[in-house]
Amino acid sequence: MGAWGIKALERDEGLDVLDILKNEYVPEHPVMDLGEMIELMKEEVMLGADFSQIDFLFDNTAMALAELYFQWKDNGKLDYDYEEAIWDKVTGFTASKEALAFLLRQLTDIKNEVPDEDGIREIVDLWKNEDSGEIAPAWLEHLNQLIDRLDSEQEARQMYIKKYWGNFIGGSDDSLNLVAFLEDQKQEEIPLS
């Protein structure tokens, strides 16, 4: 298992995520959709079918997808060197409420060390000091930042919907949920300002 940093994309399994996306997703999807990518990773058995399936690979993949999403949000591009320059073809990156919720739940389960059938959370165990049991502070901070940003994305999305749609539809929870669903169907990125 090779790793050269604290990020999920800085290990061999993260490169596997990038290779799958490069070969099977990006060529046909200039606008990347986080929900579609999650489904592709489930099909490729890089993510579990549900949260009860706990594995190092699944956890690393969830973190890698969150890292990719925020790399796009921060830079407006995905910066990976491939001869074909396939990543330059990406023009957008969308995320539905469900996709954000999926990653938030997966990463929160990691933080809370929800155990696998062997009683551990392998990805956390790998970052623990054998003597003290302390989780590597830099890795834990990175995980917490991803969780905080996913949570903020969900909140910003809800605020956008309430701000721009609340007056038109009366602001009831059912109406706002309908608007959220319709916004997800548009496949457009929701501005956060």
PLM regions: where:
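Short, extreme N-terminal segment that most often corresponds to the first beta-strand
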Residues: 1-25, 192
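Residue-level detector of well-ordered alpha-helical segments, enriched
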Residues: 33, 57-64
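Helix-start/N-cap signature of alpha-helical segments
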Residues: 10, 54-58
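Low-complexity intrinsically disordered segments
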Residues: 103-171, 179
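Short amphipathic alpha-helical segments and their helix-coil junctions
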Residues: 27-54
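Amphipathic protein-protein interaction modules
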Residues: 63-125
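Positions within ordered alpha-helical repeat solenoids
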Residues: 23, 43, 67-74, 109-112, ...
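Short acidic DE-rich linear segments
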Residues: 176, 187-193
